[in-house]
């Protein structure tokens, strides 16, 4: 049962009961990346308390949008994952990500970020319709913590790659530099000057931003929430 109920006969009211609690949407974001242990969720959701996380997970299980799975050895761990009903919320959450871009602002020094969130960004902001036929490989972050993303454009738009064929462009960089290249707000020479490694065809690299549809408000029209402000 929901913690609260809107006395309104409306499917949006029911959706708000499922998603409206603080942290609920972000828990689903984490499970869109893949199944997660409780400890993984606690680490990735910086700022959530153990008790609140437990309550939110229990509520989402009650709604049938997530469940638990026991992984066999050698993992031998219990993980949370999206159910079919939870997976059906993916396009809704990606649309919310596009909506939230208006208030994102620049990356703050104290903001937590997981490199594999970028895969969700690629899904959320992929251009509709045909895009240049190019193959890209991104290594986001450094060392063993780097996240590898492979995707290509084409007649049907952006799609992720599972093959081992070489990419036209390979980028290795920290998240903020990769974001700058994806959006076209950072020139390749400026990214290299800040430590990015970029290999491959310069013409293909120039087509990278055209794989996406990023729309930015002017700073005067879209201000991010103050740090510590309640959503």
Regions found by a protein language model. Name each.
Residues 164-231:
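C-terminal interaction segments
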Residues 85-152, 202-231:
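Acidic, aliphatic-rich amphipathic alpha-helical segments
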Residues 53-63:
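Basic amphipathic alpha-helical segments that dock to polyanions
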Residues 10-49:
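N-terminal helix-turn-helix DNA-binding core of bacterial DNA-binding proteins
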Residues 1-8:
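N-terminal intrinsically disordered/low-complexity leader segments
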Residues 20, 72-96:
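Basic, amphipathic "hinge/linker" alpha-helix immediately C-terminal to the N-terminal HTH DNA-binding motif
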Residues 148-170:
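A short, structured beta-strand/loop element
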């Amino acid at each position: 049962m929901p913690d609260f109920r809107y006395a309104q006969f409306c499917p949006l009211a029911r959706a708000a009961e499922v998603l409206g609690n603080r942290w609920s949407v972000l828990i689903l974001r984490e499970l869109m990346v893949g199944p997660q242990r409780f400890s993984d969720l606690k680490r990735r959701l910086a700022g959530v308390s153990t008790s609140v996380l437990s309550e939110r997970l229990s509520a989402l299980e009650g709604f049938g949008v997530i469940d638990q799975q026991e992984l066999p050895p050698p993992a031998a761990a219990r993980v949370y994952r999206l159910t079919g009903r939870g997976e059906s919320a993916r396009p809704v959450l990606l649309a919310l990500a596009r909506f939230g871009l208006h208030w994102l602002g620049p990356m703050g020094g104290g903001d937590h970020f997981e490199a594999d969130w970028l895969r969700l960004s690629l899904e959320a902001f992929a251009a509709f319709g045909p895009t240049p036929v190019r193959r890209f490989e991104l290594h986001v972050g450094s060392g063993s913590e780097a996240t590898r993303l492979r995707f290509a454009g084409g007649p049907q738009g952006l799609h992720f790659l599972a093959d081992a064929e070489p990419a036209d462009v390979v980028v290795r960089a920290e998240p903020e530099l990769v974001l700058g290249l994806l959006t076209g707000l950072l020139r390749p020479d400026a990214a290299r000057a800040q430590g990015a490694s970029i290999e491959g065809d310069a013409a293909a690299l120039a087509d990278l931003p055209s794989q996406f549809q990023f729309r930015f408000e002017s700073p005067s029209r879209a201000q991010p929430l103050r740090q510590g402000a309640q959503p």
